Amino acid sequence: MAEITVETRVSAPRQSLVTLTHVLYAMHAFSALMGLLTPAFIVTSFLAGWPSIIAVIVNLIKRDDVRGTYLESHFSWQLRTFGYALLWLVVMFLVLVTLGIPLTLVTLFVGLPIAVVFAIGLGIWVLYRIARGWLALIEGKPIRVPS
């Protein structure tokens, strides 16, 4: 059977945009790592930290500038990391609130530990996504983002 290949044209990005993408990964990483150094969880520090929020705003503003380059995949990767982390944190909060009404021993000994484990797992996932994306950027490669 013949193999079908699809070749897409990707233009080389300007160096300033590559540098900007490194800065955005650094901002996300800084916010996430603050969760290790403070009483906050990694994921809450990542989502509520000013550097991460500013990085997301810049991602949205500069999205058109990177369209058609391999940096487009990195911008999508960063936005999806933030968006999915926020979504899962909201889901976790809703589950905890649902289990927590009324406040019982079950909530304290079952719901809260589940939420803590979930928040730690989500934080590890955020760190993984930042590291994987940044390493691909260092190599000058796009990130595979499902459509």
Briefly describe each language-model feature range.
Residues I124-S147:
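Cytosolic juxtamembrane helix at the C-terminal end of the final transmembrane segment
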Residues R63-F82, L137-V145:
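Amphipathic, cytosolic membrane-interfacial segments at TM-TM junctions
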Residues M1-T19, K141-S147:
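Low-complexity, intrinsically disordered extramembrane tails and loops of integral membrane proteins
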Residues T5-V6, P39, V43-S45, I138-P142:
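Conserved catalytic or regulatory cores that recognize and/or transform ribose-phosphate-containing ligands
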Residues I53-D65, Y128-A131:
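Membrane-water interface of transmembrane alpha-helices
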Residues I61-D65, L99, L103-T107, W134-P142:
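Membrane-interfacial segments
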Residues V18-V56, L79-L127:
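Hydrophobic alpha-helical transmembrane segments in multi-pass membrane proteins
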